[in-house]
């Protein structure tokens, strides 16, 4: 009985000291001798914090949800469609990954862009870790921002004229070489992407019922690039590492269509060929791709604070390598992933989990003898 009471008292003392350590980590650094002459001391340990995924389209989340669950991390989705934001309250502790899409308005989520801007500004003002934060969301929402940033970094980009409003489109088109393409400044899914081989058909489009008005009233007129080999390439980057490159077949030409109408709607390529059929995949792993452009994209991501992105480029018939799009809201293609033997969602989950482990430390009891 005396021995049992002694053991109980020792255990109570340890539990009390552990509780006090949680309140005041400087309470004691003295090793504690437990039953069996084992000595325990307090040491720092990495403890994972919560991951929040900011988005506006739940249909794109399942692969990431599955990967995060498999990684064993605590996570929560944060849809920014409609809501409120208490600017006087601090944000929750955690890692925040923004998957806001430039095509959000096409799903009726017209408030999502500015909602996300506000939330990211709020998070960053409180020092929270944000993957693809405030600076990056501006690049996602504006192809002008992408174009100017890429050009400033020394990348070759397509000749482009930005037209603000509707009335000058036909006049400005006359300064373009034929053929040329149009696209929306705030796009995604190939919004507003069309090819024109003559000015008459362009004029008819602008004046006709099929004209697609850009949500931000900015239309880009851009040179048409003739791809050598009949494909375009996209390079995927996650957490400062090259994942893989994929190709999209353009052999049937480049009268372009929205990605949602193509064979692989989960692949958020900016350019998607009209030849897409429901029974085939136009997207494949580009095996053995080791071009120096990869390291340049990695450097660009580091410079701009981009954690996760896809860069699209065309190798032209006249020998140019032209980068035309940056997508910071990648949806990974299952056909490509099977061919490459690598999973984008899995590596995203591991990247976020590593950030979460780095963010928080705590002091725990560990045996020392």
Mark where each language-model region is.
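Conserved N-proximal alpha/beta basic substrate-recognition cap immediately N-terminal to
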Residues: 56-159
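C-terminal active-site "lid" helix and adjoining low-complexity regulatory extension at the edge
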Residues: 288, 302-306, 315-369
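Phosphate-binding site of ATP-dependent enzymes
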Residues: 194-301
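Short, Lys/Arg-enriched N-terminal segments with co-localized hydrophobic residues
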Residues: 29, 34-47
């Amino acid at each position: 009985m005396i021995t049992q009471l002694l053991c109980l008292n020792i255990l109570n003392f340890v539990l009390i000291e552990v509780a006090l350590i949680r309140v005041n980590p400087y309470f004691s650094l003295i090793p504690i001798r437990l039953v069996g002459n084992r000595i325990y001391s307090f040491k720092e340990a990495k403890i994972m914090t919560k991951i929040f995924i900011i988005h506006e389209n739940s249909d794109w989340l399942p692969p990431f949800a599955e990967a995060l669950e498999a990684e064993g991390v605590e996570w929560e989705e944060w849809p920014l469609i409609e809501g409120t934001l208490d600017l006087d309250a601090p944000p929750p502790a955690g890692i925040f990954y923004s998957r806001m899409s430039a095509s959000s308005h096409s799903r009726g989520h017209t408030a999502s862009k500015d909602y996300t801007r506000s939330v990211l500004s709020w998070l960053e003002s409180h020092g929270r870790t944000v993957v693809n934060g405030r600076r990056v969301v501006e690049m996602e929402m504006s192809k002008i921002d992408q174009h100017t940033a890429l050009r400033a970094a020394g990348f070759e980009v397509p000749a482009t004229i930005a037209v603000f409003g509707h009335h000058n489109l036909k006049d400005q088109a006359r300064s373009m070489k034929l053929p040329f393409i149009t696209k929306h400044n705030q796009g995604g899914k190939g919004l507003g992407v069309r090819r024109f081989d003559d000015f008459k058909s362009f004029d008819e489009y602008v004046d006709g019922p099929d004209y697609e008005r850009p949500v931000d009233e900015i239309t880009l007129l851009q040179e048409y690039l003739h791809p050598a080999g009949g494909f375009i390439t996209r390079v995927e980057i996650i957490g400062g590492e090259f994942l893989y490159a994929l190709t999209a077949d353009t052999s049937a030409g480049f009268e372009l269509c929205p990605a949602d109408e193509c064979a692989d709607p989960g692949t958020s390529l900016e350019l998607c060929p009209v030849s897409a059929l429901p029974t085939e995949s136009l997207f494949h792993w580009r095996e053995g791709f080791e071009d120096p452009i990869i390291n340049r994209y990695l450097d660009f991501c580091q410079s701009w604070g981009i954690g996760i992105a896809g860069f699209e480029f065309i190798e032209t018939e006249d020998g140019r390598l032209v980068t035309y799009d940056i997508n910071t809201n990648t949806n990974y293609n299952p056909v490509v992933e099977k061919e490459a033997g690598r999973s984008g969602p899995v590596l995203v989950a591991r990247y976020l989990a590593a950030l979460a482990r780095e963010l928080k430390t705590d002091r725990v009891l560990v045996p020392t003898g």
